[in-house]
A protein has these predicted regions:
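Active-site-adjacent structural elements that line small-molecule/cofactor binding pockets in enzymes
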Residues: 1-298
Length: 298
């Protein structure tokens, strides 16, 4: 049992956002971070995903939040590593940009991580926004939303059936399957959502969703869209999880206030993001999280 949050037994699951952009290429820092947040009692570690960054010198007027100089560890590979050095920490992609990847290969990679971690993977997926990245990976940027639904459907079948035949508009499998299958059958799939089509997709397809807005009227409207889409698909909206995000600004009271807002909004999970707070080392990130774990009571 952890020292802080995880030892409190509350239904809200409080995790962390792995500081992808601020830890650099240090494997020891990745290990230290994963082990320490588990010790502190956080329930899960969420990692963002970008395979390549755009070079602003080539892409004139580039205005994206990340570029070719921004560090990103590949989430599923990193999770294979973290699975070996942690024991209870849930490993969450938040989100992996699914349509720029091959669905069957992602299903295989996810199954392997779930197996090696003994059932600790939660696969968050989304569409992404970077056309440069799609081009580099040889995938179509313009139809990514239409393809994602098929990808989720196909992956779930691959995780639960020994052999699969699937004939979709964008994907085809003829009598093939994964071995070994994952521990969790199927692996939970969560969807990052902001637009109405994405919110409807989350309600229709997902086990949970990541809102791209803060608690308030816009979140209330988004939750209603997700719920109505779930009902139309014959699903129970109350069974769909929702994960909010707390932004660390150096103030435990403010973090506690944000947690209370997400709790009131109906979140089942939250994650604490320490990126962008001026923290320079893994130890500084962990010190901030220790303050959160030691003072927030959930």
């Amino acid at each position: 049992m952890g020292e802080g949050l995880g030892a409190l037994g509350h239904s809200m699951r409080v995790g962390v956002v792995f500081p992808q952009t601020e830890l650099g290429g240090d494997a020891a820092a990745v290990r230290a971070y994963g082990q320490r947040v588990e010790e502190l009692g956080f329930t899960h570690l969420l990692a963002y995903d970008h395979v390549v960054g755009a070079d602003p010198a080539v892409h004139t007027g580039w205005a994206g939040p990340y570029d070719v100089h921004t560090t990103f560890h590949e989430p599923l590979v990193m999770f294979g590593y973290l699975a070996a050095v942690t024991t209870t920490l849930e490993l969450v992609t938040g989100v992996i940009i699914l349509p720029q990847r091959q669905a069957v290969l992602v299903a295989k990679q996810a199954a392997e991580v779930d197996l090696l971690s003994e059932g600790r993977l939660r696969l968050g997926v989304g569409l992404g926004w970077n056309a440069v990245e799609y081009e580099a990976l040889g995938e179509n940027f313009t139809n990514r939303g239409r393809r994602l639904g098929e990808q989720v459907e196909l992956m779930r079948r691959l995780w639960t059936e020994q052999t699969v035949t699937y004939d979709g508009k964008h994907h085809r499998v003829s009598g093939a399957g994964l071995a070994p299958l994952p521990v969790t059958r199927p692996i939970p799939v969560w969807i990052g959502a902001a637009s109405r089509p994405a919110l409807e997709r989350a309600g229709r397809l997902a086990d949970g969703w990541f809102p791209m807005m803060s608690p308030g009227p816009k979140l209330d409207e988004a939750r209603d869209i997700v719920a109505r889409s779930a009902i139309a698909a014959g699903k129970d909206p109350s069974a769909i999880g929702m994960e909010g995000r707390i932004t660390w600004r150096g103030d435990v009271r403010q973090a506690a206030d944000e947690l209370a807002q997400w709790t009131a909004a109906g979140a089942t999970h939250v994650s604490v993001n320490t990126m962008g707070a001026g923290l320079r080392t893994v130890d500084e990130h962990l010190a901030a999280l220790a303050a959160v774990a030691g003072n927030i009571r959930v």
